[in-house]
């Protein structure tokens, strides 16, 4: 009887140990959470206290156009809205969760073909350099972001170090 108890206890401990090894806290992180509506978060990459917060931007809406406040600008203060179907570029500085505009990002956009200097409209991306994307090809995990830019056939992959984004 005593032997049976020891065996059951050891098997239970072994199973618990294997379960703990397979699951790390980082496995539960989903950077997409909070990227829609007024969540003001971005799905991109950064390191703790890093200089770079590299992430896609789905639109850039100015706060003021000809003296008129743009009410949708507030939704884009982190640069990314999950509901959007296009990416206008990737930038290296973002604030997450602040609810305030961020750092005057400079966009980079990989592309092939003719040079286009206008981002185009979300409803007609062909007139500019923005590209459609599909969430099925988007991957966001701590330290890594990937998305297929459908209009260019380019897989964009992002990661960051303490002082740079790649």
Residue ranges and their predicted role:
Residues 1-23:
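Bacterial Sec-dependent N-terminal signal peptides
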């Amino acid at each position: 009887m005593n032997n049976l108890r020891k065996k059951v206890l050891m098997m239970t401990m072994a199973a618990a140990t294997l379960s703990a090894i397979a699951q790390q806290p980082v496995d539960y992180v989903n950077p997409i959470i909070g990227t829609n509506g007024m969540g003001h978060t971005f799905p991109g990459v950064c390191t703790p206290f890093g200089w770079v917060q590299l992430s896609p931007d789905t639109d850039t809406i100015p706060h003021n156009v000809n003296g008129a406040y743009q009410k949708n600008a507030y939704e884009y203060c982190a640069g990314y809205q999950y509901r959007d179907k296009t990416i206008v570029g990737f930038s290296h500085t973002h604030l997450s969760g602040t609810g305030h505009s961020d750092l005057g990002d400079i966009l980079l956009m990989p592309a092939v073909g003719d040079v286009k200097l206008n981002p185009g409209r979300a409803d007609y991306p062909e007139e500019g350099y923005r590209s459609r994307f599909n969430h099925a090809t988007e991957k966001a995990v701590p330290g890594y972001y990937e998305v297929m830019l459908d209009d260019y056939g380019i897989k964009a992959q992002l990661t960051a170090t303490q002082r740079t984004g790649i």
